[in-house]
Amino acid sequence: MHFLQNSLIAAAMGAALVAAAPAADLDARSSCTFTSASAAKSGASKCSTVTLKSIQVPAGETLDLTGLKSGATVIFEGETTFGYKEWKGPLISMSGDKITVKQASGAKINCDGARWWDTKGSNGGKTKPKFFSAHKLNNSKIQGLKIYNTPVQGFSIQSDHLTISDVTIDNSAGTSKGHNTDAFDIGSSTYITIDGATVYNQDDCIAINSGEHITFTNGYCSGGHGLSIGSVGGRSDNTVKSVTISNSKVVDSQNGVRIKTVYKATGSVTDVTFQDIELSGITKYGLIVEQDYENGSPTGTPTNGVEVEDITFKKITGSVDSSATRVNILCGSGSCKDWTWSGVDITGGKKSSKCKNVPSGASC
């Protein structure tokens, strides 16, 4: 009898342990903290909450968070740093569906780009790693990250339904030697929203090379090349459509707002609105549309292979430096049309003598 009772008790305890094991395993996977890049790479895809605690990413390696579990939350905690090596990067790569990316209070991502900066950016000198690959990061959110001193380009975005809010990219230390430190480069993407970005850099605050339904709003851009569409043309995807860039400030930058298309290329830029943009301390062009871009430089001869149609410039105000040009429109024959132009009031600087094929209603 005692033997039977003991056997029953043992069996019951064993059954309880077997039942508890999967639950414990699930608990372990629901929230994970990683302190190394290798551990995060091998384990993050199993976790619903991924905490990255003061990770020191080894030189030449990517903090690889691709293939995250659907609905996962990623939290940067402490200071994330990266070892030095000349390579193309990216320093961080992330993909998944319905992902939320944020940081704990006081956290920062410190790229220490000064180790690579040599005034040449991605045009020579040291090979520099790009910062963050957000490719196939769909139906997701990136919130409140504080990023310092990217070696070259910041976010490379090829995703659908991605919202980036209240992100700071501070490359102000790169004023003398930083170059090509674009904050947000967008290509082949749909329904991208960037809201409340604060950017100090040495290239485009945003550059939209292709994509549809893209919004940039409530931004502050300092030190770079302004708010840009393009360059468009010469890629596999050369369509920009349904873009709104609004309620933003561009200060101490080369350009204010810009559309640039590639010389002799084909493509289209349609349904684009620049609205409520305030400029100050602009050193080259307050507003520029140029269809003569070749190998990174203007030729002075625009071509008409890229349509720039249904464009709105509304309430673009502020000032440019005395040596700068207020507005420059250099369009190919017949390629710029159906523009809406109202409340464009840029002061200082000089009037352009190079405008060509200015569409009806616009003023150069």
From Swiss-Prot:
Q: Which GO terms describe its biological process?
A: cell wall organization; pectin catabolic process
Predominant place of localization: secreted
Q: Which residues are glycosylated?
A: N138
Superkingdom of origin organism: Eukaryota
Q: Which InterPro entries match?
A: Glyco_hydro_28 (IPR000743), Glycosyl_hydrlase_28 (IPR050434), PbH1 (IPR006626), Pectin_lyas_fold (IPR012334), Pectin_lyase_fold/virulence (IPR011050)
Provide the E.C. number(s) assigned to this enzyme: 3.2.1.15
Q: List the disulfide bonds.
A: C32-C47, C205-C221, C331-C336, C355-C364
Q: What are the residue ranges of the propeptide?
A: 21-29
The signal sequence is 1-20
**Family matches, as SUPFAM superfamilies:** Pectin lyase-like
Instruction: Enumerate the PbH1 repeat regions by residue range.
Output: 159-188, 189-210, 211-231, 240-261, 269-291, 303-348
Q: Where does it reside?
A: Secreted
Gene3D superfamilies linked: Single-stranded right-handed beta-helix, Pectin lyase-like
Which function does this protein serve?
Answer: Involved in maceration and soft-rotting of plant tissue. Hydrolyzes the 1,4-alpha glycosidic bonds of de-esterified pectate in the smooth region of the plant cell wall.
| Annotated family | Belongs to the glycosyl hydrolase 28 family.
Protein's recorded name: Endopolygalacturonase B
